[in-house]
Amino acid sequence: MSGNTFGTLFTVTSFGESHGPAIGCVVDGCPPGLALCEADIQAELDRRKPGTSRHVTQRREPDTVEILSGVFEGKTTGTPIGLLIRNQDQRSKDYGNIADTFRPGHADYAYTQKYGFRDYRGGGRSSARETAVRVAAGAIARKWLHERFGVAIRGWMSALGPIEIPFVSADAIDGNAFFAPNSAIVPELEAYMDKLRKSLDSVGAKITVTATGVPPGWGEPVYDRLDAEIAYAMMGINAVKGVEIGAGFDSVAQKGSEHGDEMTPQGFATNHAGGVLGGISTGQEIVVNMAIKPTSSIAQSRRSINRQGEAIEVATEGRHDPCVGIRATPIAEAMLALVLMDHALRHRAQCGDVLCATPRIPGKIA
């Protein structure tokens, strides 16, 4: 199966299936000398792992990462970094009833049409289980970006189904199961999810992720524009159906006099562009929003077909997230880190010696 490698200079090649013995990845292109240990990666994996609240899948996976190569005496060597996460709580018997059927909204039908065969256990390769290794790889990129440039990446849930979540404080994000930047709204989110779970249904979400401290100049026009690669990365996350950069679709209703971010010696007046102009970073905050569809695995009976093309009714058993968006924040952060890391190295390779006479202005007016 092709399409398993992400990146140009900083690459991640992942492998494994939801119910296989392990998942993992090979990270290539990491500069030597970065202090790195398993604890650096584990901290990010623990934010994403399943079974952490009643509102997510109850599959219990410790998601313990093993560094197999590329690190010696606590520092990266510049050679490929092998990462492995062993699966420990597979329950494949839950999927026996869908071996010959297709779940509505899932990749089952598409995989069968493409390959003529599929691993039906937990979705196999199409499962969001694979995103654990993206988070692991993203932790490496995130650490290098922060230490080298001071880049800070932060994501949060900005809507759960019909409930908009106003941003109040970044300090609240890691203090609740939803990654909500507003502690006061958590009881409402919990009540909504409890009611939803009883109805045997699922719901979508909106995730916002930002990056501050990104220098101006990153991005490779015209086909590898920074915003295009960010959108590509986010659309590669399971269940993501839409991505916005900056004002996004709100740009449709804006006038040019409003949308164009005015510049002053003191900084940019606004950030409708989301930190990218002409496919190149401006030094402003990079702002990304993504729409995540409702979980396709629900216990309600729905119409479908079997492998013979016959009409059937199918209800999905097993342990599933009633809202996959609840655990998507660390994944979105990781993918943004991977894109920025790749473009930092690409910029250094081609334009590392460029000295611009025009002074940099702040990302926003103080």
Swiss-Prot record:
Record field: catalytic activity: 5-O-(1-carboxyvinyl)-3-phosphoshikimate = chorismate + phosphate
CDD domains for this protein: Chorismate_synthase
Gene3D superfamilies (alphabetical): Chorismate synthase AroC
Signal peptide residues on this chain, from the entry's feature table: none
Biological process according to GO: amino acid biosynthetic process; aromatic amino acid family biosynthetic process; chorismate biosynthetic process
Free-text remark on how the cofactor is bound: Reduced FMN (FMNH(2)).
InterPro entries named among the record's database cross-references: Chorismate_synth (IPR000453), Chorismate_synth_AroC_sf (IPR035904), Chorismate_synthase_CS (IPR020541)
Enzyme Commission number(s): 4.2.3.5
Binding locations of FMN: R125, S126, S127, N238, A239, G278, K293, P294, T295, S296, S297, R319
Necessary cofactors: FMNH2
Assigned keywords, A-Z: Amino-acid biosynthesis, Aromatic amino acid biosynthesis, FAD, Flavoprotein, FMN, Lyase, NADP
Pathway(s) of this molecule: Metabolic intermediate biosynthesis; chorismate biosynthesis; chorismate from D-erythrose 4-phosphate and phosphoenolpyruvate: step 7/7
Primary enzyme class: lyase
GO molecular function, one term: FMN binding
Cell inner membrane as UniProt keyword: no
Pfam families reported in the protein's UniProt record: Chorismate_synt
Positions bound to NADP(+): R48, R54
Residue ranges of coiled coil: none
Subunit structure: Homotetramer.
NCBIfam families: aroC, PRK05382.1
Role according to the record: This reaction introduces a second double bond into the aromatic ring system.
Family: Belongs to the chorismate synthase family.
HAMAP family membership: Chorismate_synth (MF_00300)
Name of the protein: Chorismate synthase
Taxonomic lineage: Bacteria, Pseudomonadati, Pseudomonadota, Betaproteobacteria, Rhodocyclales
Gene from which this protein is expressed: aroC
